[in-house]
Amino acid sequence: MKRDGDTLHTLPLTSTGYVRRDAKAALWPIRWKIESILPYQREYALLRAAFRGGDTHANRYKVGKILENVESYDETSAYPAQQRTRNFPITTFRWLSGEDLQMSNIIDYIRHGRAVVGRYVFSGLRLRNEREPVPYLSLSKTQSSSFVVDNGRLLSADLCTTALTEIDLAIVMRQYCADKIACEEAMIARKGPLPKQYLDVIDKYYQDKTMLKNGPDGETEDEA
């Protein structure tokens, strides 16, 4: 508290709070750019509906078995790497209407590098490969009827409505097939790198973490 000039009122509740504060401070000089693309209520509601966490699921064909001599690996600093190397929405989202909501046009927008967030309806949804180890769609993130699930993941459904980003849609199209796919609503934005001021904060935290790990009391990057 003394080092950062905090009081009980301003003290971040978690370690992430310090990172958020540094990011906000770095972006303060261009706050007008950030404020100009903030979503309105309708856009925010669709973004929240499309939000999902990490993709973790047990293979239903391996349940109850003890596997010997298995291996695993961890990708170091995966989230910062994505922020540093990928493009993200950098403009206000624009709603599509009319013919633009046809799936062929949605796919064209994605091919041209646009961020697309939409709500899709799948009729006769089913896995392309019935032995798919990690089905992507979670029942809790959809409105589905006459469905078959494995520990919360959809294997099939007569009707399934769900909100997806363009990244999610590509995964769903790769894993599932359907008799019919329709887009109820969708919005698009141009993608580009995150602001340099924000990326500089990411770089600093990564460098600090790496120095600590490689120090005399830390672990090396290979051990991380």
Predicted regions and their residues:
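Conserved acidic
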Residues: 1-224
